[in-house]
Structures are given as C-alpha cells and as structure tokens.
A protein has these predicted regions:
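Polytopic transmembrane helical bundles with strong interfacial aromatic enrichment
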Residues: 1-39
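Feature for soluble, non-membrane regions of globular proteins
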Residues: 44-237
Length: 237
C-alpha cells in the first residue's frame, strides 16, 4: 500500500500519496511553445511575452469528452486571461527575464497565481491526446512498484481529484528520491514549489468541466482518463 502523508496549510489540505524523481527539467524558457517538456534549454534572460501554447490537436478533436466550446472558454479565454495578467504584472520587474518555472518557484501573490495557472494549464493541455495509446511499460512498472498497480494509481488519483475541496489541480509528480507522488493542490498550486517534478495533472477548477458536465466532476475525471497522452507522461520519468 502506498505511504500517505497529509500536510495542512492554513485553511486547506494538500494530500500526498507517495508513489518517483530524477533532476527537474521541465520548463526553463520564457515563451510557451508546443511542447512544455522541451523548454529547459533556453539560457536567454531577455524579456519576452508569454503567449498561448500551440496545441498538437484540433480543439474539436477531444469531443465529446471535452467539447470545442469548452476549449473556446478554457483554453481561449481563461488561459489567455492568465497569460495577459502575467505579462502585465511582470513588466518592468525581474520576473520579466525569468523562465516561467522560475517565476512559479519564486513568486507569490498575483504574480504566482497567474504564472502558476499559465504553467499548469499549458501542462494540462499538452498532456491530452485524441489518439490515446497504451501506457508504456516503464510507467506501468513504476506505478506497480510504488502504488501496487496501475488500477490502484487510477483509483487513488481519481479519489484525490474528485475529493479536492473547491478549485485546484491533482498531480502525479516525482520526488528527488525517485518515488512517484500524487499531490492534490488547491487553487493555483504546483508541485514544483515543493521540489517535485510534475508528470501529469488534471484541472478540477469548475471552468474545466462546467460547460460539458455542469457539476459532475466525477464524470469529467472519468472521461479525462481516456484523453491522457501516456507516452508524454512516461517520457517525463
């Protein structure tokens, strides 16, 4: 059985289920691109504007599990607003020259919220696919080693996502010691702030599912599983 650790923060709970983390190499570039996993090579410290990521699929391609209308609002409006707010907030500050992941790790207040939501949403959208392939063996083996089985992981992750009070994100991440971790984060929370490496996330803010599912978060999470790009998740190990 996985080792479970609960940490109380102020007025909300973040649930940890310890289940794997080499060195962190996710995002270290100022501009969002089509592949968040390749953003670690930029050493430029010049000021750049954050922009919407280009999606590797058409916005209608995930329907009916995720409709084009949901993408119009979730991707085209909500994410765009976070990006616009971030660009305004960091203009003329040291954050304007920082990679996005560095902003997430160092900032607080409004800068953190908008930077983290920009990072989180980009990561979420770029881990979806209309053509899901079987989970690669190395990921399945890691989950079996640390959680017991792939099914046990899905059950624990689903419970964390559906049970998260209010808005937030549920993550599969890697610890520095190599264990996989399920982290339930409220609001704009991101496991990079704890020294963890994100592998997978689901957005459980209401704007992620309300158009298609109204208040049926559990149904949204159930259908989201069919849209996960397991190869991308495995490549992050």
């Amino acid at each position: 059985a996985p080792y479970v650790l609960w940490i109380l923060f102020a007025t909300y709970l973040n649930g940890y289920i310890l289940v794997k983390n080499p060195d962190n190499k996710i995002v270290t570039q100022n501009v969002l691109t089509t592949n968040i996993d390749t953003l670690s090579n930029s050493k430029n410290r010049q000021t750049m504007k954050h922009t919407l990521p280009q999606l590797p699929y058409k916005t209608e391609a995930l329907a009916p599990k995720m409709s084009a209308e949901t993408f119009e609002y979730h991707y085209g409006k909500h994410l765009q607003t976070y990006i616009d707010n971030l660009n305004k907030l960091i203009e003329g500050t040291p954050y304007a020259e920082m990679p996005l992941d560095e902003i997430v790790r160092k900032a607080d207040g409004g800068v953190f919220n908008n930077a983290a939501q920009t990072w989180n949403h980009t990561f979420f959208f770029l881990t979806l696919t209309p053509d899901q392939q079987p989970m690669p063996e190395k990921l399945a083996a890691a989950l079996a080693r640390d959680v017991g089985s792939v099914e046990a992981f899905r059950e624990a992750f689903t419970k964390a996502a559906v049970g998260l009070f209010g808005s937030g994100w549920t993550w599969l991440a890697q610890q520095p010691d190599g264990k996989l971790v399920i982290v339930a984060e409220s609001n704009a929370g991101n496991p990079m702030t704890r020294g963890l490496k994100p592998l997978l996330t689901v957005d459980v803010w209401e704007h992620a599912y309300y158009i298609d599912y109204r208040n049926r978060r559990a149904e949204f999470v159930k259908n989201w599983w069919d849209l996960v790009d397991w190869q991308k998740v495995a490549d992050r190990l």
